Curated annotation (Swiss-Prot):
It is found in: Mitochondrion inner membrane. Binds 2 heme b groups non-covalently. Component of the ubiquinol-cytochrome c reductase complex (complex III or cytochrome b-c1 complex) that is part of the mitochondrial respiratory chain. The b-c1 complex mediates electron transfer from ubiquinol to cytochrome c. Contributes to the generation of a proton gradient across the mitochondrial membrane that is then used for ATP synthesis. It is a multi-pass membrane protein. Its cofactor is heme b. Heme b b566 binds at residues 97, 196. A ubiquinone binds at residue 201. It comes from Alexandromys fortis. One of its GO terms (cellular component) is respiratory chain complex III. The keyword Transmembrane applies. This is Cytochrome b. One of its GO terms (molecular function) is metal ion binding. The cytochrome bc1 complex contains 11 subunits: 3 respiratory subunits (MT-CYB, CYC1 and UQCRFS1), 2 core proteins (UQCRC1 and UQCRC2) and 6 low-molecular weight proteins (UQCRH/QCR6, UQCRB/QCR7, UQCRQ/QCR8, UQCR10/QCR9, UQCR11/QCR10 and a cleavage product of UQCRFS1). This cytochrome bc1 complex then forms a dimer. Belongs to the cytochrome b family.
Length: 380
């Protein structure tokens, strides 16, 4: 009798994706982040669903409804903090996942990579709108500042901003539509994830050597299911330590003050995972230029396959580009730090230097390093 997992139409699909999937025999723990991101998405959807049962998207009651969740709902405080810190864990995994992709040249699987870039934009949009919902000071002013950037678009800018706001300022209409979008987007993200996986399984996974591994495959289950499970345990442990012991460490104290359109906080800044992009935005004195740099700071990832000059796929055997890569990582950490600092000397000049370095390393230095390595190794 044939095994049901190989005959049943639905189970067969799942089996080919998770159980009998041929996987490279040498993929390291850097390949765990895909499954961890899946777990983060599930956690966010579930906690978000339970929060939505008690949340009201009205400017007069939004803040107090979040307070009510934390005070009066059974384990409401836990659900709320799991959702808030779950977003941070999501972005940590995302950045590591993207970093892995850049290091090992996974961007050469163009369809999978571009789908990933679209996913990154979708997750960032979702997180931004979610941050507005508690209707604290930083929620309100963050929404005002970021949506207002669209007014830099020539000719249609002002109309576009007022259309998104649903009025002449961030108000009830804005909050209601942000809640609607924040609710629907994770389900769209889930659909995009399936497409991401579909494209991935067309080519098969990359591996740390960057070489073709078709001759050396092992079944995904049990080898990588058990390996993913270890990653999941570590993630959940870090996540619960963060949620139960330091729930507010990544948040902004200003968001515990109800939104007040008449009182601007001294330093408006987004959540930590947007700070690098915010620093790039602020480093350009021109409004439209800043907006373009902000978008390009993420969109530049889509150019990675075009900027690849090396005859080798991964950075495993490329010390010069490796050096550039780790300088880029350090540069992103500097940008993240600068994004949270006030706009004054010396932070302005540090931010501008780090922003120039960011684009220079990706667009100029890494491609040149690839060519130099080709010459050194006579790979022309």
């Amino acid at each position: 009798m044939t095994v049901i997992r190989k005959t049943h139409p639905l189970i067969k699909m799942i089996n080919h994706s998770f159980x009998d999937l041929p996987a490279p025999s040498n993929i390291s723990s850097w390949w765990n982040f895909g499954s961890l991101l899946g777990l983060c998405l599930i956690i966010q959807i579930l906690t978000g669903l339970f929060l939505a049962m008690h949340y009201t998207s009205d400017t007069t009651t939004a803040f107090s409804s979040v307070a009510h969740i934390c005070r009066d709902v059974n384990y409401g405080w836990l659900i709320r903090y799991m959702h808030a810190n779950g977003a941070s864990m999501f972005f940590i995994c995302l950045f590591l996942h993207v970093g892995r992709g850049i290091y090992y040249g996974s961007y050469n699987m163009t369809e999978t990579w571009n789908m990933g870039v679209i996913l990154l934009f979708a997750v960032m949009a979702t997180a931004f709108m979610g941050y507005v919902l508690p209707w604290g000071q930083m929620s309100f002013w963050g929404a005002t500042v970021i949506t207002n950037l669209l007014s830099a678009i020539p000719y249609i800018g002002t109309t576009l901003v007022e259309w998104i706001w649903g009025g002449f300022s961030v108000d009830k209409a804005t909050l209601t539509r942000f809640f609607a979008f924040h609710f629907i987007l994770p389900f769209i993200i889930t659909a995009l994830v399936l497409v991401h996986l579909l494209f991935l399984h067309e080519t098969g996974s990359n591996n740390p050597t960057g070489l073709n591994s078709d001759t050396d495959k092992i079944p995904f289950h049990p080898y990588y299911t058990i390996k993913d499970f270890l990653g999941i345990l570590i993630l959940l442990m870090v996540f619960m330590i963060l949620t139960l012991f330091f729930p507010d460490i990544l948040g902004d104290p200003d968001n515990y003050t109800p939104a007040n359109p008449l009182n601007t906080p001294p330093h408006i800044k987004p959540e930590w995972y947007f700070l690098f992009a915010y620093a790039i935005l602020r480093s350009i004195p021109n409004k439209l230029g800043g907006v373009l740099a902000l978008i390009l700071s993420i969109l530049i990832l889509a150019l990675m396959p075009i900027l690849h000059t090396s005859k080798q796929r991964a950075l495993t055997f490329r010390p010069i580009t490796q050096t550039m890569y780790w300088i880029l990582v350090a540069d992103l950490l500097i940008l993240t730090w600068i994004g949270g600092q006030p706009v004054e000397y010396p932070f302005i000049i540090i931010g501008q230097t780090a922003s120039i370095a960011y684009f220079t390393i990706i667009m100029i230095l890494m491609p040149i390093a690839g060519m130099i390595e080709n010459n050194i190794l006579d790979l022309e």
